[in-house]
Swiss-Prot record:
Keywords: Cell membrane, Lipoprotein, Membrane, Palmitate, Signal. InterPro entries: PBP_domain, Phosphate_ABC_transporter. This is Uncharacterized lipoprotein MG412 homolog. A lipid is attached at residue 23 (N-palmitoyl cysteine). GO terms for cellular component: plasma membrane. The lineage of its organism: Bacteria, Bacillati, Mycoplasmatota, Mycoplasmoidales, Mycoplasmoidaceae. Pfam families: PBP_like_2 (PF12849). It is a lipid-anchor.
Length: 372
């Protein structure tokens, strides 16, 4: 049966582009990498294609997930036009310094996301669990899976609940921090100062050097797959646990999270227990934050480079209210002017100075890798 009426505007544009390919220059841009960057960039690129496309230089943008390591591999090996990475790219750049320089790679920070932990607990524990600098290592031991960690470790003020001992299950990302930007942010960017050194075994497991222990249930990389594994496993009676997710995902699915009986873990900074939220990130009271980055090659022979530059110029410097709405919908914070300046070689973060923005990472004065 003919179903043209059901085609989305984007599908119609793609079909039109194919039919009239002789009448317009169509640039196909591919983006691969972080599952946290993917939904945001997909929405932004779809909006751009539908509303701001240059009729004389049509562009189509395909955004696929796969993890931050896949994004770095794709951009360094020329398998994609954009590599998406939800972590600081400095370690990748230093590991592949000559290749990074030869390809003139530039890290573009799209915005800021945060990590949030959600948990399932017995009714007597609901609202009572708090992460602090004193039990941070217990959280890491839980997700490493090599030790049994009781829920009472996270009860505020150390007040245990009589006859209520429940070992938790951690749901980490497969491959650990080596493969996942979300996992790296979970391990390294809590904003809490550990009071004790993390157990060597737990550290190596979470870094991805060793396999998870028997008490962990590793999940796929994407937020939705991690959440679904968490939900499905913990529907069994008397099982309790924790999973870390993108704050944007948590914000957008809060009703579902609450309907399943889950809670969001508070984090205590300077004696103030903070619930993760976009407002708390913006005010710097919640510090478990990571960058959402795209990496592109600035080599002149890159055929899609002009189209890529037009897209990111629109995204970062047009001050378009539609962009802000998309960011708000995903719970992602836009960069401040000062943060954008870090991606420029000189001067201010304005379109009038855009030539100084399109400078590769190793040619910047401070050799910065994105804005954060």
């Amino acid at each position: 049966m003919l179903r043209v009426a059901r085609l989305s505007r984007l599908a119609l544009l793609s079909l039109t582009a194919v039919i009239f390919s002789g009448c317009a220059n169509i640039n196909l841009i591919s983006a691969v990498g972080s599952s946290s960057v993917q939904p945001l960039l997909s929405k932004l690129s779809s909006h751009y294609v539908l509303n701001h496309n240059d009729k004389d230089n049509l562009v189509e943008i395909s955004v696929q997930a796969g993890g931050s390591s896949a994004g770095v591999k794709a951009i360094t090996k020329g398998l994609a036009d954009i590599g998406n990475v939800s972590k600081n790219t400095k370690s990748y750049a230093e590991e592949n310094k000559q290749l990074w320089m030869d390809k003139k790679l530039k890290t573009i920070t799209l915005g800021k996301d945060a990590i949030a932990v959600i948990y399932k607990a017995p009714s007597e524990f609901k609202g009572k669990l708090v992460l602090t600098k004193d039990n941070l290592n217990d959280l890491y031991d839980l997700f490493a899976g090599s030790k049994s960690v009781d829920i009472n470790k996270f009860v505020e003020n150390g007040q245990t609940t009589k006859n209520s001992n429940h070992n938790l299950i951690g749901f980490p990302r497969t491959g650990g921090a080596f493969a996942s930007g979300t996992a790296e942010a979970f391990l390294k960017f809590s904003g809490l100062t550990q009071t004790k050194t993390l157990d060597k075994d737990s550290k190596e497991i979470l870094e991805g050097q060793r396999n998870y222990g028997p008490n962990a249930r590793p999940t796929s990389e994407t937020n939705i797959e991690a959440f679904n594994t968490f939900v499905t496993t913990l529907r069994q009676p008397n099982l309790y646990g924790m999973v870390y997710l993108s704050l944007g995902f948590v914000n957008n699915n809060m009703n579902l999270i609450k309907s399943e009986g889950f809670e969001v873990l508070k984090v205590k900074y300077d004696n103030n227990a903070v619930t993760p939220s976009s407002q708390a990130v913006s005010s710097n009271t919640y510090k478990w934050v990571r960058p959402l980055n795209s990496v592109v090659s600035l080599l002149p022979k890159q055929k899609t480079l002009p189209s890529i530059q037009r897209f990111f110029n629109w995204l970062l410097f047009s001050n378009n209210s539609e962009i802000k709405k998309i960011y708000d919908d995903f719970g992602v914070l836009e960069l401040t002017a000062d943060e954008k300046k870090k991606m420029f070689k000189t001067g201010n973060a304005e379109m009038s100075n855009i030539a100084n923005f399109w400078v590769d990472d190793y040619s910047l004065n401070n050799q910065t890798f994105g804005a954060l």
